[in-house]
């Protein structure tokens, strides 16, 4: 697997968390949260992020239930991944994102309690969790 920069996405109908990571350290950092309207991403902002970071691949979290059932957002996340590949001609990998939001909320709570938990930050931290999981699994 090539060393380099990777972008992770936590897809949601209202917000899409974005993180950047690298294979060398298998770590990721939150970048931003991109607004979406009824599940339609702001493709111009996504284009800017991809142009700025020039990633090797894109990693998208795939929401599923604890018992492996798919959620209503699962098919939307798959469509988002397909659109990313079609628009940017980059490899796109899907990662089981089970409990990534719970982990992100826990991290933010540890940093400053309940008041520290802001929805936009949760989404970008969840994208970090998703991306780091993929980086560690694909090594």
Curated annotation (Swiss-Prot):
GO terms for cellular component: cytosol. Gene3D superfamilies: YqgF/RNase H-like domain. Its EC number is 3.1.-.-. It is an enzyme of class 3 (hydrolase). Pfam families: RuvX. It comes from the Bacteria. Could be a nuclease involved in processing of the 5'-end of pre-16S rRNA. It is found in: Cytoplasm. This is Putative pre-16S rRNA nuclease. PANTHER family: POLYNUCLEOTIDYL TRANSFERASE, RIBONUCLEASE H-LIKE SUPERFAMILY PROTEIN (PTHR33317:SF4). Belongs to the YqgF nuclease family. One of its GO terms (molecular function) is nuclease activity. Keywords: Cytoplasm, Hydrolase, Nuclease, Ribosome biogenesis. Its main location: cytoplasm. GO terms for biological process: rRNA 5'-end processing.
